[in-house]
Amino acid sequence: MLHLKVQFLDDSQKIFVVDQKSSGKALFNLSCSHLNLAEKEYFGLEFCSHSGNNVWLELLKPITKQVKNPKEIVFKFMVKFFPVDPGHLREELTRYLFTLQIKKDLALGRLPCSDNCTALMVSHILQSELGDFHEETDRKHLAQTRYLPNQDCLEGKIMHFHQKHIGRSPAESDILLLDIARKLDMYGIRPHPASDGEGMQIHLAVAHMGVLVLRGNTKINTFNWAKIRKLSFKRKHFLIKLHANILVLCKDTLEFTMASRDACKAFWKTCVEYHAFFRLSEEPKSKPKTLLCSKGSSFRYSGRTQRQLLEYGRKGRLKSLPFERKHYPSQYHERQCRSSPDLLSDVSKQVEDLRLAYGGGYYQNVNGVHASEPVLESRRRNSALEVTFATELEHSKPEADPTLLHQSQSSSSFPFIYMDPVFNTEPNPNPDPRDIFSERSSLSSFQTSCKFSGNHMSIYSGLTSKVRPAKQLTYTDVPYIPCTGQQVGIMPPQVFFYVDKPPQVPRWSPIRAEERTSPHSYVEPTAMKPAERSPRNIRMKSFQQDLQVLQEAIARTSGRSNINVGLEEEDPNLEDAFVCNIQEQTPKRSQSQSDMKTIRFPFGSEFRPLGPCPALSHKADLFTDMFAEQELPAVLMDQSTAERYVASESSDSESEILKPDYYALYGKEIRSPMARIRLSSGSLQLDEEDEDAYFNTPTAEDRTSLKPCNYFLA
């Protein structure tokens, strides 16, 4: 038995026991099973051969024939095939492993790019590993961990970008990181030193589109698969034969010299595998052995091609299995996962007051244990909402125009979706006065999205959907208009209600409809039928008296001796004066602040509640039925309808780098160079020559025509 050590991308190691005669596929399958990896064809096992070259473990060849001392070799689990667009990766685990590979390439200097681009990528890695920005923690972590060769001079930029990623989950950070990396010139490039026919030092590399020729980090030539007729090697010379109609004035065979025969053969095998994975529709078949002994190589690619992977994933056969990310527990637990909501921050104390006043709902955590106060004791420093609130408060000076508030968006995104409550807007012909004083229902919890997997799940993912049906607690900023026979021409002071349903107002009135609509009819309030002396009617009468005193005071200040609220037409100047008077009494403050006690309630794009709280929404149609027989002031009619609080997912940094067409994984159409790559059904053909091995790609006449297909995810 062989005890073989495999090192994974998170630097963890595991020893697998295989049979003495096992092939490389046995060890590779054990490694993928250890990770619960479904899209395994993108990866491979690399090791250092006896000649000092890094080579890939062949899956069809016995391990003992590839490695002299297997027990002393450490096999490295790495990304082997880099797709043109990481949006082709269906599984979150696959994207996470690609992110770890990008992280290693950054540390080794394999991905040269600008300082801003490098700092932005590292900031996404920090967001995935540490959570939201915290200056002290970030500074300490960057001092202990090396992400870049020149990290010291970029720490300021890294922390600046990390501060803009508040609220993003690790999965979202992985997608953004891969979207940046795929646009770099050296993405997925593994250069192999060589020299051309004139003795100039160059590097050869293979990618999804073909064979590349580089000088330093600059591509000086690209030979697409469609141009190549044959790839072969002879001793340490690597040969590229082109189609005759491609370069008429140049030689159809290009020769490059590599360091050794082993290095040349290893690069040739990599080219064979890349061509099969990206160009063939299915795995190439094995050739029957000939009677005569051949000295040529019989190497072929083993595994599913990219086309098969995409078709297999499109049919939904790939199973998403849970996995554990690499985090830094001491820092992560100390900060209580700052991506989770902070229910006790200064901004959200009003929501907590509502919960205490209107009964504790009943929630269920991830372990199935019910709790009435979920995560109410998690005080932290610099929570996600606090940082966002401070940023928005700074941007809101001077005061923002209330008419433009609905166009603003928060720079942070929270993983919550507040659904619209379902209201019954039908008028109730027989309102029951007891409903006004009925028992209030408990607050309904809401469905959260679990962005963190494994044991690093954030605190907020313990809240689940509501356990029992309950009525939504609705915030209604409705002016309390007395139910009298007179029309109110002046905007009364707004009285806010927190009730389980819209406030029900008795509909009795002795005035006939034609009398109310007549402009010359007037009925004294004393002529109305007296109501029952209930506490509610007493309060209504008191409010009417206070309102009349206030109206008379305003009339005296405006130069009018009498106010007829029922007969004469509404004076818009007087109404404006009244509204301005009330607004002047309100302290000046920014409209972006999330204060539920202001005269005009902030819109949903600025107020983002962070915990189990009632769905706060404007419902102009809720009280149109209650006051259907009265003319509401015009200022009420501009109230917006029910709003949906949906966390945005936007990035404010390096917008020229991030493009929206990447998210093919979530249903958006992808426009990428892959659409221009023509898939070929050609197979490999190996000729038998002494010390010579190569493969032929079919010519333009022999190439099997394949119907153009779009293998991008819908």
Swiss-Prot record:
For this protein, the record's SUPFAM superfamilies field holds:
PH domain-like, Second domain of FERM, Ubiquitin-like
An example GO biological process term is: nervous system development
Note the coiled coil stretches, chain numbering.
537-558
Q: Tell me the tissue specificity.
A: Expressed in liver, kidney, pancreas and at low levels in brain and heart. Expressed in embryonic brain and developing neural retina.
Q: What is its main location?
A: other
InterPro entries noted in UniProt: Band_41_domain, FA, FARP1/FARP2/FRMD7_FERM_C, FERM/acyl-CoA-bd_prot_sf, FERM_2, FERM_central, FERM_CS, FERM_domain
List, alphabetically, the Pfam families matched: FA, FERM_C, FERM_M, FERM_N
Question: Record keywords: Nucleus included?
Answer: no
The record's subcellular location field reads: Cell projection, Neuron projection; Cell projection, Growth cone
Tell me which residues make up the FERM domain.
2-282
GO cellular-component term (any): nucleoplasm
Q: Which disorder is recorded?
A: Nystagmus 1, congenital, X-linked: A form of nystagmus, a condition defined as conjugated, spontaneous and involuntary ocular oscillations that appear at birth or during the first three months of life. Other associated features may include mildly decreased visual acuity, strabismus, astigmatism, and occasionally head nodding.
Functional summary from the UniProt entry: Plays a role in neurite development, may be through the activation of the GTPase RAC1. Plays a role in the control of eye movement and gaze stability.
Name of the protein described by the UniProt record:
FERM domain-containing protein 7
